[in-house]
Amino acid sequence: MRVVIAGAGLAGLACAKYLADAGFTPVVLERRDVLGGKIAAWKDEDGDWYETGLHIFFGAYPNMLQLFKELDIEDRLQWKEHSMIFNQPEKPGTYSRFDFPDIPAPINGLVAILRNNDMLTWPEKIRFGLGLLPAIVQGQSYVEEMDKYTWSEWMAKQNIPPRIEKEVFIAMSKALNFIDPDEISATILLTALNRFLQEKNGSKMAFLDGAPPERLCQPLVDYITERGGEVHINKPLKEILLNEDGSVKGYLIRGLDGAPDEVITADLYVSAMPVDPLKTMVPAPWREYPEFKQIQGLEGVPVINLHLWFDRKLTDIDHLLFSRSPLLSVYADMSNTCREYSDPDKSMLELVLAPAQDWIGKSDEEIVAATMAEIKQLFPQHFNGDNPARLLKSHVVKTPRSVYKATPGRQACRPDQRTSVPNFYLAGDFTMQKYLGSMEGAVLSGKQCAQAIAADFNPQTVPPTREIVTVG
């Protein structure tokens, strides 16, 4: 059976991969000229890559890690030491670390927290631990139930001191969903904390060794095409065409550069588009179906990713850093963390500006200037003096609608991969799966979509979703 998939991000490509495994013929259509969706990247005139986001692979990403294994590209993940490193704004140029020892979970996480005396006092650690007990004891059902609260509200409910939010969770909230704790659903942070505490290597981080379209998406494309599938770029979906009974008749693809529109048909159809464009594409007869009503409550969150090249090394740290800056979220010196971007003499900082709502409409020059002011606080030793570090060039990548904005109540808006339309399915990290808006969530949604199709139309099975895998 032929299955046409709109969208070549991780959800669409993962869906196609697992459909190919189950004996289907997937045909993936991507509207842009680059693969990857939210992990897309481009090369500039100097041959330097710039990316949509700063992409981190966690040990708590079992389906993503399984995918790397199945593609035989595990060596492309560059694992970092098991730590979480925070800037200390009150002591510019210094860091506070949570180092996880090589012992079983949750003991390793508790030791990491107890050893850190820079950010939290002992009474605060005890209050935080007591506040977390319901989530640890009651598990996922409690975590899901807390979707009615923001993280700030949940912390107040649990009598956790507000300073803990300021010291740790503003940074974590911005890293997970690009918004602040007074907006983000408590479910998001509790889910992350649960995975990090329950799995020995859950919070261990890896960087991809190069640009995602080449190092992750292309192996997926090769895998799909070797098994009879197809992947096409520059194929924007214009309209979902319907039969009289409301099922899908075909995908109308907009012709580019003067070419005529074309209709692509198949036995089954998948949307692996982000939720915002999907909402605009829903045909009128479908709008009363529950899943298409549900998604009206979802919208993508804006985010800005910056790349800044300097004339010297600003840091030797080979890891993700939590800036704890009012403007920025996480950042890394990619000349240290990523093999393809390696440079022993010059830094290339990749930084996430979040929340980005007030900045998405500003010029690149304004954004770079504001970011540079923050960088001077992060690396004062390189900017104070007679010979300050010099910015050589920059790239700013704006995503007005990224992952869905995970405010309270959004869990109820996330649809299943099956729809009320018998030949139409959904994939995307906004669909219901337990890893929320993330690369793992995208891969898992694609796998779950393929599993649903295989269960409905083919006795061959897709490999089961993974719970935990061991990482190096």
From Swiss-Prot:
Biological process GO annotation list?
carotenoid biosynthetic process; response to herbicide
Q: In which pathway does it act?
A: Carotenoid biosynthesis; lycopene biosynthesis
Q: Which UniProt keywords apply?
A: Carotenoid biosynthesis, Cell membrane, FAD, Flavoprotein, Herbicide resistance, Membrane, NAD, Oxidoreductase
Q: Report any Pfam family annotated for this entry.
A: Amino_oxidase
User: Which branch of life, at top level?
Assistant: Bacteria
Does the keyword Oxidoreductase belong to this entry?
Answer: yes
**E.C. numbers:** 1.3.99.-
Q: Where in the cell is it found?
A: Cell membrane
UniProt GO molecular function: phytoene dehydrogenase activity
- GO cellular component terms? plasma membrane
Family per similarity comment: Belongs to the carotenoid/retinoid oxidoreductase family.
What is the name attached to this protein's record?
Phytoene dehydrogenase
What organism is the protein native to? Synechocystis sp. (strain ATCC 27184 / PCC 6803 / Kazusa)
Question: Which gene is this protein's source?
Answer: pds
